[in-house]
Amino acid sequence: RSAQAYGAQVLTYHRVTSVEREGERISAVIVHDERGGEDIRIECGFVLNCGGPWAGQIAAMADCHGVDVVPGAGIMIAMNHRLSQSVINRCVWPADGDILVPDHTVCIIGTTDLKADDPDRLSIPADQVQQMLDSGEAMIPGFRKSRAVHAWAGARPLVKDSRVSATDTRHMARGMSIIDHNTRDGIYGMLTIAGGKLTTYRLMAERIVDIM
């Protein structure tokens, strides 16, 4: 909303389909309106690629290959009661279902962490839901007396970490990574950012804008 107040135009439900270049310089981005069905060409002098788990795909559209963003899929479940007044986190090695967050009249338990093949096609396996509910009962006795009202999945845009297995998303670093494609690929006019967490998104935005 702040960006809109300063004149930004926000296009929701628009998917990037191609990135155009004039020589070695980014010149435009083509997006597809997933609701209206039309394609829109956006001329630009610079692109900040903040595409999350799709950032590597967008970079490749500009012939900037090898941006290794690993989608780390996780599910969360909302229960129909607010079972605590503050966040509860189990003091254990990182695991599934080890944090409970109160939110208005409900509470949310999370989260799993598995590598996804495609961030556009995330599943919510029944066995993972069951595992999360069992973990909630271990954290708060009586947890299972509440009813699960909603479950959803998302993908973390993790940067490939050579210190762990390529599929071990739980232990991949959560730090941010900014790539200047002029320095890396000889393509002027695009920066890519990946990694980070929701708690650091404002810092990430500040850093990439400062570099631009």
Model-based region annotation:
Residues 2, 57-61, 65-75, 79-108, ...:
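C-terminal catalytic lobe of FAD-dependent flavoproteins
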Residues 2, 13-16, 32-36:
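Flavin (primarily FAD) cofactor-binding/catalytic cores of flavoenzymes
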Residues 9, 18, 43, 97-99, ...:
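Short, surface-exposed charged micro-motifs
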Residues 9-11, 149:
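General small-molecule cofactor/ligand-binding pocket signal
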Residues 35-46, 50:
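Core beta-strand elements of the Rossmann-like FAD/NAD(P) dinucleotide-binding domain
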